[in-house]
Structure formats: structure tokens, C-alpha cells
Curated annotation (Swiss-Prot):
It comes from Beatragus hunteri (Hunter's antelope). One of its GO terms (cellular component) is respiratory chain complex III. Binds 2 heme b groups non-covalently. The chain crosses the membrane at residues 33-53, 77-98, 113-133, 178-198, 226-246, 288-308, 320-340, 347-367. Component of the ubiquinol-cytochrome c reductase complex (complex III or cytochrome b-c1 complex) that is part of the mitochondrial respiratory chain. The b-c1 complex mediates electron transfer from ubiquinol to cytochrome c. Contributes to the generation of a proton gradient across the mitochondrial membrane that is then used for ATP synthesis. Gene3D superfamilies: Cytochrome Bc1 Complex, Chain C. It is found in: Mitochondrion inner membrane. Keywords: Electron transport, Heme, Iron, Membrane, Metal-binding, Mitochondrion, Mitochondrion inner membrane, Respiratory chain, Transmembrane, Transmembrane helix, Transport, Ubiquinone. Pfam families: Cytochrom_B_C, Cytochrome_B. This is Cytochrome b. The gene is MT-CYB. One of its GO terms (biological process) is mitochondrial electron transport, ubiquinol to cytochrome c. It is a multi-pass membrane protein. Heme 1 (or BL or b562) is low-potential and absorbs at about 562 nm, and heme 2 (or BH or b566) is high-potential and absorbs at about 566 nm. GO terms for molecular function: metal ion binding; ubiquinol-cytochrome-c reductase activity.
């Protein structure tokens, strides 16, 4: 009798995606982050579901409901901190996953890459709205500052902001709708992730060399299932170390103060994973210009296939491009640091230089490096 996993309509899909899938024999640990992102997403949905059972999305009770979860609900504290720090792990995996895609030229799978960019935007939107829910000082002022950026849009800006707010300021209506969106978006992300995977399996995985691996494929199970389990264990270990030993390490102390519209915190800043984009936003003195730079800093990923001038797909055998890539990584780390600093000298000029460098590297220097390498190889 033929195995049920190959005949059953539902099992067949799972089999072709996770068991009998032909995978390149040489994919490194950088290919683990896709499965880790899936684990993060499941973990966030589960912890979020249990948090939603006790949370109230009302300005009068939101802050105290989070306190109630931590103090009175059985294991509420661990669920809350797993959710908050799970978001950080999610973004660490996301950035490494995107970085892998840039380094090894995975962006040449156009559909997979573009859905990935949409996934990145959706995840950022979800995380932003989730940060507003505890209704602390940084929640309130973060929501006010970021939603206010939309007022820079000509003609419709002010109306758009008031429409999103559901009033003339960030208030009860805003909190309620943010909770509704924060709840629904992860399920949309799950659907998009399935489409992401569907398009990936149309072409098959890339590999570190960037060369076709059709001649040398191995089954996904057991080789990559065991490898993914190791990655998952390390991810959970890192998350639990963070949750149990330093749960507030990546948070802002200001968020332990209930939201007060009459008192502005000295330094308004988002969570660490948005700081690079926040630094780019702040480095431009013009409001609309800043907003455009902020959006373009992520949207520029869509242009990567067009900016690929090399005759080789991967950076594995391209030392000049490798150098440029790591300068870009260093630049992003610099921007992340600057985003968390106050707006004063010398941080302003460092932020402006790092922002210019970011766009210069992606739009000019990296394509130039690829062209130089082509010429050196007489291609």
C-alpha cells in the first residue's frame, strides 16, 4: 500500500513542503531562519491569544489589566514577557533572514522576495500596534508621534490622521482599533507566509554558492528537520534566558508609567528593532522628507533585484561586495544606536551621515562593486 502521506489530499501538501521536499545539500545555518520565524509566529499567536483573554482595550483599564496579568493571572508574567521578548526574537530572525537574502542573492526569486517585503511591513505594523496596547507613557507618545507622521501627506494628511485616531487625539477609539488590528494581522501574516513558502517551493531553495543545485538534492526530512529542531532549541533557549533573567532589558522604563497626555517623556523612542528607521526619519529636517526616507528605507528592498549588476548571484566569491555588505551591516548598527540617542550634537550629524551612507551603499556603491568585480573577472 502506498504511504498515506503521499495520497491523502492534506498530508500530501505537508509531505511536499516539509518531508519529501528536495533541498540543496549545502545550505548553511543561515537557511534556518525561515523555520525559526515560523516558530516565532506560532509562539506570538499562542501567547497573544492568552494575553487577549485577560486584556481590556480601554484607556481607563488597559494599563491595570496588563498589571493584573503579571500579578494575578497564573503564569501571566511569563506569558506577557514571552510575548514582549518574543517580538524581539522575531525581529532578530527577520533581520538575519533578510540579510541572508541580500548576501546570497535570494532576491532573484521575485515573487518570494516581494511577498517577504510585504511580510516585513505587516510585521512592523503589528509590532507597532502591539507596543501601544499596554498604554504606558511610551505607548501613548509613540502612537502619537508615529501616527502624526501621516499628517505630512499633502492635502489629505490631517483628515487621514484624525480618521485613524477616531477623534482629535490618540484616545479610547485609537486603542480599541489598534487592539483589533493587532489581533487580526498575525493571521494575515500567517496566510502571507504560506504564500511565501508556496512561491519558494515553485523554484526551490537558493544555496550559498548561488549556483543551481538541481544536480545535488537531498530530502528535507530527516536532514533539515533535525537541523531546524536544533535551531528551534537554541532560539527557545535564548528567548527563555531573556524572559527569565532580563525581561525588561529591551523595554523602556517609561512604559511602566501610565499614559498621561499632559506629560511628555524626555526622549520618545520606539522599540530597539525600529531604531534604525527612526534614526533615518529624524536625520531629515523636513517632515515629509523624513517620512519618505522612513518608508524608502524598507521599500528599497523591492529594488534589490534591479540593482543586481553582478554576473554571479551570491556574494560568496565576491570579496569587494562582501566588504560593502558588512559596511552596510555596520551602518545599520550605527543607525540603531543613533535612534536611541537624544537629538543633540554629535548624534545629529552622525545620524545624517549614516542615513546618507545607507542609501549610498545600496543604490550606488554595491552595484558599482559588482560591476568592478565583473570587469576584474573579464566578464
Amino acid at each position: 500500500m502506498i504511504n498515506i502521506r503521499k495520497t491523502h489530499p492534506l498530508m500530501k501538501i505537508i509531505n511536499n513542503a516539509f518531508i519529501d521536499l528536495p533541498a540543496p545539500s549545502n545550505i548553511s545555518s543561515w537557511w534556518n531562519f525561515g523555520s525559526l520565524l515560523g516558530i516565532c509566529l506560532i509562539l506570538q499567536i499562542l501567547t497573544g491569544l492568552f494575553l487577549a483573554m485577560h486584556y481590556t482595550s480601554d484607556t481607563m483599564t488597559a494599563f491595570s489589566s496588563v498589571t493584573h496579568i503579571c500579578r494575578d493571572v497564573n503564569y501571566g508574567w511569563i506569558i506577557r514577557y514571552m510575548h514582549a521578548n518574543g517580538a524581539s526574537m522575531f525581529f532578530i530572525c527577520l533581520f538575519l533572514h533578510v540579510g541572508r537574502g541580500l548576501y546570497y542573492g535570494s532576491y532573484t526569486f521575485l515573487e518570494t522576495w516581494n511577498i517577504g517585503v510585504i511580510l516585513l511591513f505587516a510585521t512592523m505594523a503589528t509590532a507597532f500596534m502591539g507596543y501601544v496596547l499596554p498604554w504606558g507613557q511610551m505607548s501613548f507618545w509613540g502612537a502619537t508621534v508615529i501616527t502624526n507622521l501621516l499628517s505630512a501627506i499633502p492635502y489629505i494628511g490631517t483628515n487621514l490622521v484624525e480618521w485613524i485616531w477616531g477623534g482629535f487625539s490618540v484616545d479610547k477609539a485609537t486603542l480599541t482599533r489598534f487592539f483589533a488590528f493587532h489581533f487580526i494581522l498575525p493571521f494575515i501574516i500567517t496566510a502571507l507566509a504560506m504564500v511565501h513558502l508556496l512561491f519558494l517551493h515553485e523554484t526551490g531553495s537558493n544555496n550559498p554558492t548561488g549556483i543551481s543545485s538541481d544536480a545535488d538534492k537531498i530530502p528535507f526530512h530527516p536532514y533539515y528537520t533535525i537541523k531546524d529542531i536544533l535551531g528551534a532549541l537554541l532560539l527557545i533557549l535564548a528567548l527563555m534566558l531573556l524572559v527569565l533573567f532580563a525581561p525588561d532589558l529591551l523595554g523602556d522604563p517609561d512604559n511602566y508609567t501610565p499614559a498621561n497626555p499632559l506629560n511628555t517623556p524626555p526622549h520618545i523612542k520606539p522599540e530597539w528593532y525600529f531604531l534604525f528607521a527612526y534614526a533615518i526619519l529624524r536625520s531629515i529636517p523636513n517632515k515629509l522628507g523624513g517620512v519618505l526616507a522612513l518608508v524608502l528605507s524598507i521599500l528599497i528592498l523591492v529594488l534589490m533585484p534591479l540593482l543586481h549588476t553582478s554576473k554571479q548571484r551570491s556574494m560568496m566569491f565576491r570579496p569587494i561586495s562582501q566588504c560593502m555588505f558588512w559596511v552596510l551591516v555596520a551602518d545599520l548598527l550605527t543607525l540603531t544606536w543613533i535612534g536611541g540617542q537624544p537629538v543633540e550634537h554629535p548624534y545629529i550629524i552622525i545620524g545624517q551621515l549614516a542615513s546618507i551612507m545607507y542609501f549610498l551603499l545600496i543604490l550606488v556603491l554595491m552595484p558599482m562593486a559588482s560591476t568592478i568585480e565583473n570587469n576584474l573577472l573579464k566578464w
